[in-house]
Regions:
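Non-heme di-metal
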Residues: 1-106
Length: 106
């Protein structure tokens, strides 16, 4: 069971690193640093390869029908259960940027 938890944690970490590096690449492009942007994109691709390997090892890639159902379930859960309290809490704390970010994710 610890290995499955480790795979889940590794998958989450690799996935987050991928998205972060792509955001860094975009910023480097905006600052006219194409070489650095390319480096970040290469690192992001490597993180994707790692994340996919972890997902496969967890048995997380199934038939397309199963994958579609999983995606629908996940998006519905975010929309109905995750983001509404996040929006409310950000609003209560006066954090407009977080409130907007959470609301746009719904």
């Amino acid at each position: 069971m610890a290995t499955l938890d480790n795979l889940k944690g590794a998958f989450a970490g690799e996935s987050q690193a991928n998205r972060k590096y792509l955001a860094y690449a975009k910023k480097a492009d905006q600052e006219n640093l194409p070489g650095i942007a390319k480096l970040f994109r290469a690192a992001a691709h490597a993180e994707t390869v790692h994340a996919h390997a972890h997902l496969r090892a967890m048995g997380g890639i199934k038939s397309t029908l199963d994958n579609l159902q999983d995606a629908v379930n996940g998006e519905d859960f975010e929309f109905t259960r995750i983001y509404p309290p996040y929006v409310a809490e950000a609003k209560a704390e006066g954090n407009a940027a977080a409130e907007r970010s959470f609301a746009y994710a719904m």
